[in-house]
Regions:
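The serine-hydrolase catalytic nucleophile loop
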Residues: 39-51
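Alpha/beta-hydrolase active-site loop
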Residues: 45, 81-102
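Conserved alpha/beta-hydrolase
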Residues: 50-75
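Hydrolase active-site cap/lid region
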Residues: 128-175
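Short beta-strand/loop motif that positions the catalytic acidic residue
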Residues: 196, 202-204, 208
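Catalytic histidine-centered segment of alpha/beta-hydrolase-like enzymes
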Residues: 236-247
């Protein structure tokens, strides 16, 4: 059972309000996740993350930025015309200070997670605190904000750089002020983000209409080698729908468990064939092709790959994908990899993997491998974490 309660804290004389999510009383300190919402949204946007991870033993907090979002009982103080990324950094720092006063919080294990502007703010805050933050998860972070100021288009609006107004209305109805422009117009976001030396997970939509994908590639490149896991969601926009979100959560969970994304396979469906059908059973085969182009292995799926999907009665379809890849490993050795990926009793996809590559066998040896399936039009990306 997940408990939810409203909390409030202060930044100076401004009240910050939000919610705390936990799985109930615990006699041990819980790792902390603080979730920051995007521009023009509010803390309810982050509740799916908080509920999922509180069920898995985290103490989760979502909150409303001062002047940055929220309505009703959860609205924080402040005007939107006084808000910018630096005031939001101060908001997040105030929430972190609040967490330090909670007896059940393991303040040596804090994860900052944020979406869009909240993701950018989380990254900048992690850079300030560095070793005090264990993990940073940025989802479609709005790293474009400084460039948008330099182009006169903050918040999706258009304004004259030679005659900047004191305030303007954005397409989403939010009114922001000139001080936001002045605060970020000279910022190099990559220099700031690179100051953080902890673990980073960066998730981006390939077709994000708000934050061009190139910003996320450059952000990934600004971190040290091996520091950042970068997930590109094929056909993804600025945020993700219900068909993708469950596996985004598995990606994040695997990252927080210390797993590495050891391989991603892009799968494209070629045909569907009915294998068997009775009154209480239906079995189909989804045939597919595809490829993997990661650092540890590059290759293609061989012909004959099939996902056998079986439905008993009114239950859900159970999936069992069986396929072989042929290519080269990181040591440039030709090899094959055989994968059988099916859903375990705990609901996770737990593939078995075999290979004639010594490098690949050592890579997966002794690891609890979990697969996340991110569907897109015509196929899916299978991420293997271990």
């Amino acid at each position: 059972m997940i408990s939810e309660k409203v909390f409030e804290t202060y930044k100076g004389n401004q009240k910050i309000k939000g919610k705390i999510f936990s799985a109930g009383k615990s006699d041990v300190k819980l790792p902390v996740m603080i979730a920051s919402h995007g521009f023009g949204c509010d803390c309810t946007e982050m509740e799916s993350y908080c509920k999922y991870f509180s069920e898995r033993g985290y103490l989760c907090l979502s909150y409303n930025f001062c002047g940055g979002g929220g309505r009703g009982e959860l609205q924080s103080d402040g005007e939107s015309t006084e808000m910018n990324v630096f005031t939001e950094i101060e908001d997040l720092l105030a929430v972190i200070e609040y967490v330090k006063g909670l007896e059940c919080a393991d303040t040596d294990n804090i994860t900052l997670l944020g979406f869009s502007q909240g993701g950018f703010v989380s990254g900048l805050t992690a850079s300030r605190l560095n070793e005090k933050i264990a993990n940073l998860v940025m989802i479609c972070p709005a790293i474009c904000i400084p460039d948008h100021a330099r182009l006169g288009m903050l918040g999706g609006a258009k304004y004259d750089l030679d005659n900047i107004p004191e305030s303007w209305a954005c397409p989403n109805g939010m009114v922001i002020g000139r001080q936001f422009h002045e605060a970020v117009k000279d910022m190099d976001p990559y220099l700031e983000l690179a100051k953080f030396k902890g673990k980073v997970l960066l998730i981006a939509g390939e077709k994000d209409p708000v934050v061009n994908y190139s910003y996320q590639v450059k952000a990934y490149q600004c971190y040290e080698e091996g520091q950042c896991e970068f997930l590109m969601i094929r056909d993804g926009g600025h945020g993700f729908g219900a068909d993708v979100m469950p596996n985004i959560l598995v990606d994040i969970e695997s990252f927080l468990q210390g797993k590495k994304n050891i391989m991603s396979v892009n799968v494209f469906c070629t045909k569907v064939e009915e294998f068997d059908k009775t009154d209480d059973m239906h079995r189909i085969g989804v045939f597919f092709t595809g490829y993997s182009d990661g650092d540890d292995f590059r290759g293609i799926i061989l012909p004959g790959a099939c996902d056998t999907q079986t439905k008993i009665g009114d239950g859900d379809y159970k999936l069992c994908a069986d396929y072989t890849l042929s290519g080269v490993d990181k040591e440039k050795q030709e090899c094959i990899i055989h994968v059988i990926n099916k859903q375990a009793e705990d609901g996770y996809f737990r593939p078995t993997i075999d290979s004639d590559s010594k490098y690949i066998r050592n890579l997966i040896k002794g690891k609890d491998i979990v697969a996340a399936l991110e569907f897109f039009d015509g196929g899916l990306t299978v991420r293997l974490w271990g």
